[in-house]
């Protein structure tokens, strides 16, 4: 159970970072 919780927590963090990075690059105008 702890492993699954840690996995989902890591997945959520990675998704949040990726989204923030994509939005940041989009605002700058690189994409």
From Swiss-Prot:
Membrane topology, record value: Single-pass membrane protein
Pfam families: PetL (PF05115)
Transmembrane segments: 4-24
Keywords noted in UniProt: Chloroplast, Electron transport, Membrane, Photosynthesis, Plastid, Thylakoid, Transmembrane, Transmembrane helix, Transport
Compartment(s): Plastid, Chloroplast thylakoid membrane
UniProt-recorded Gene Ontology molecular function terms: electron transporter, transferring electrons within cytochrome b6/f complex of photosystem II activity
One Gene Ontology term, aspect cellular component: chloroplast thylakoid membrane
Main location: plastid
Gene Ontology biological process terms, A to Z: photosynthesis
Electron transport among keywords: yes
Domain of life: Eukaryota
InterPro entries (alphabetical): Cyt_b6/f_cplx_su6
Role description: Component of the cytochrome b6-f complex, which mediates electron transfer between photosystem II (PSII) and photosystem I (PSI), cyclic electron flow around PSI, and state transitions. PetL is important for photoautotrophic growth as well as for electron transfer efficiency and stability of the cytochrome b6-f complex.
Matches recorded under PANTHER family: CYTOCHROME B6-F COMPLEX SUBUNIT 6 (PTHR37266:SF1)
Database matches in HAMAP family: Cytb6_f_PetL
Family per record: Belongs to the PetL family.
Subunit structure: The 4 large subunits of the cytochrome b6-f complex are cytochrome b6, subunit IV (17 kDa polypeptide, PetD), cytochrome f and the Rieske protein, while the 4 small subunits are PetG, PetL, PetM and PetN. The complex functions as a dimer.
Full protein name: Cytochrome b6-f complex subunit 6
Native source organism of the sequence: Humulus lupulus (European hop)
Gene this chain is encoded by: petL
């Amino acid at each position: 159970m702890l492993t699954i919780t840690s996995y989902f927590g890591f997945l959520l963090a990675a998704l949040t970072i990726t989204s923030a990075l994509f939005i940041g690059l989009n605002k700058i105008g690189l994409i």
